[in-house]
Curated annotation (Swiss-Prot):
Organism this protein belongs to: Methanocaldococcus jannaschii (strain ATCC 43067 / DSM 2661 / JAL-1 / JCM 10045 / NBRC 100440) (Methanococcus jannaschii)
Cofactor(s) recorded in Swiss-Prot or TrEMBL: Fe(2+)
Protein name, UniProt field: Probable bifunctional tRNA threonylcarbamoyladenosine biosynthesis protein
Domain of life: Archaea
Gene Ontology CC terms, in alphabetical order: cytoplasm; EKC/KEOPS complex
């Protein structure tokens, strides 16, 4: 079977032809380069209308049009005008050639072409582009989003900064080139919230640094170091949460060599495999659309023309994945001398004055600039110790601190002989209620955890909260709303089958202790509506 795929979600027009055994017969793209900086959606759509006929003609010179068995197109997510042109061209081809048509999810297409062109089987995927920033993993018949941007995509961040300093579009390659000449680490915000990330503050600070007269090379270096360190960290956090044995990098920004270096170093530290597709398959392309179309069609997915309406807000986790029958992927292995290895720290069991204790050491991250890494590890070690002591004043169970060594970024704390809430919450929904109570008490006292997942609660005879490395004091309702969103998304991605029950019980516990819950939940809806893609 042979499929022709059409890609046109943003500024690239792509046509690809792929066989059912994965042979790419044709794959070519033409990028829209705006006369002025920035992409105009209408002009991008005009670009697709102009270039699709050229590419299709060229494709049919390589593969006879009568050999095509299926037409696939990017149904979303993306720019509405671009998607409409792409869908119209696909429908026209389908009707003209009298071949079936299928619309596919652009984000998932990146993952599947990555798996086709590498040895990855069941990877945790970091998808980074001008329009998307997501950490994705396959769990129970869907690709679940474990982390994503809370505002703009990383590629958009780079492009906006490039426009601000009058670099050509797309700005990423020019920033990468200038960054190689940078030496000074300019102080910029580092915004990680659980497995989520935000770039708006980073972008604004970089612009201000430019206005203040900092060398452009130093700003480009610092912008990359901060942005890519944040991306690598949330990938590592998702890796520790899912225990996948592989990481794959896809999307247009995957072409950046510094980002590749960082992720490779992180994967070596976690003893997992790292994959990146060939560069021609990293950015948007028609072959990835054709390949996903084949996977879906071969496994019984058909579409009528009425079903081919575009979906600009097409979330990755909206797609029922029927083409993955069995998972054979590797699992992350924790070294034998450790009882745990998180995204930030190695955890060893020990004894101290006849007490069972653990030593939590925030180890050096080889992927980060040494100056940035030193600051992050030291500040988070101090913060965690401070908040673990503080929350006891609110009646919240937490480990006892025996010693804090800031020079070596170590904390000695009491050992809790229990199980992670992640492993028992589905069979004991009272744990969800207790988590809600704990979070309600935190918010009542203006403490934001910033990394609420079911991996950061331990259930023994009581429920203990851990890992305040990202914690902060804030009386802002939006910070509390985002705290809940982080937890909600963690539950949705990890405990999807019991999500409704867990979330309902969590809210019952939260409401029972925090009288401002209505305000926070309403604001939570508002923040969620601002997300990049919502159903």
């Amino acid at each position: 079977m042979i499929c022709l795929g059409l890609e046109g979600t943003a500024e690239k027009t792509g046509v690809g032809i792929v066989t059912s055994d994965g042979e790419v017969l044709f794959n070519k793209t033409i990028m829209y380069k705006p006369p002025k900086q920035g992409i105009n959606p209408r002009e991008a759509a005009d670009h697709h209308a102009e270039t699709f006929p050229k590419l299709i003609k060229e494709a049919f010179e390589v593969v006879d049009k009568n050999e095509i068995d299926l037409i696939a197109f990017s149904q979303g997510p993306g720019l509405g005008p671009s998607l409409r042109v792409t869908a119209t061209v696909a429908r026209t081809l389908s009707l003209t050639l009298k071949k079936p048509i299928i619309g596919v999810n652009h984000c998932i297409a990146h993952i599947e072409i990555g798996k086709l062109t590498t040895e990855a089987e069941d990877p945790l995927t970091l998808y980074v582009s001008g329009g998307n920033t997501q950490v994705i993993a396959y769990v129970s018949k869907k690709y679940r989003v474990f982390g994503e941007t809370l505002d703009i995509a990383v590629g958009n961040c780079l492009d906006q900064f490039a426009r601000y300093v009058n670099l050509p579009h797309p700005g990423g390659p020019y920033i990468e080139e200038l960054a190689r000449k940078g030496k000074k680490l300019v102080d910029l915000p580092y915004t990680v919230k659980g497995m989520d990330i935000a770039f708006s503050g980073l972008l604004t600070a970089a612009m201000r640094a430019y206005d203040a007269g900092e060398r452009l090379e130093d700003i480009c270096y610092s912008l990359q170091e901060y942005a890519f360190s944040m991306l690598t960290e949330i990938t590592e956090r998702a890796l520790a949460h899912t225990n996948k044995g592989e990481v794959m990098l896809v999307g247009g920004v995957a072409a950046n060599n510094r980002l590749r270096e960082m992720l490779k170093a992180m994967c070596e530290g976690q003893n997992v495999d790292f994959y990146v597709p060939p560069k021609e398959f990293c950015g948007d392309n028609g072959a990835m659309i054709a390949w996903l179309g084949l996977l879906m069609h071969k496994n019984g997915r058909w579409m009528s023309l009425d079903e081919t309406k575009i979906i600009p807000n097409y979330r990755t986790d909206m797609v029922e994945v029927n083409w993955i029958k069995e998972i054979k992927g590797k699992k992350r292995k924790i070294p034998e001398h450790l009882i745990g290895k998180g995204a930030e720290a190695d955890i060893k069991r020990d004894s101290y004055l006849d007490f069972d204790v653990i030593i939590k050491e925030r180890v050096k991250k080889g992927y980060r600039d040494e100056r940035l890494d030193e600051n992050i590890r030291k500040s988070r070690t101090a913060r965690e110790a401070r908040y673990l002591a503080l929350v006891k004043d609110f009646g919240i169970p937490a480990p006892y601190i025996f010693d804090v060594d800031l020079d070596n970024k170590r904390i000695m704390m009491s050992y809790i002989n229990g199980k992670l809430a992640k492993d028992v919450i589905e069979d004991n929904l009272d744990i969800a209620y207790k988590i809600g109570e704990i979070v309600g008490k935190l918010h009542k006292n203006d403490v934001i955890h910033n990394d609420l997942t079911t991996s950061n609660f331990i259930f023994d005879k009581d429920l203990y909260i851990i890992d305040f490395g990202l914690g902060k004091i804030s009386n802002l309702d939006e910070d509390k709303a985002v705290d809940l969103i982080v937890f909600k998304k963690a539950v949705l991605s990890t405990h999807h089958e019991k999500f409704d029950e867990i979330w309902e019980r969590f809210l019952e516990g939260y409401k029972s202790v925090y009288d401002r819950w209505e305000i926070i939940l309403e604001l939570m809806k508002d923040v969620e509506r601002r997300a990049r893609y919502v159903e």
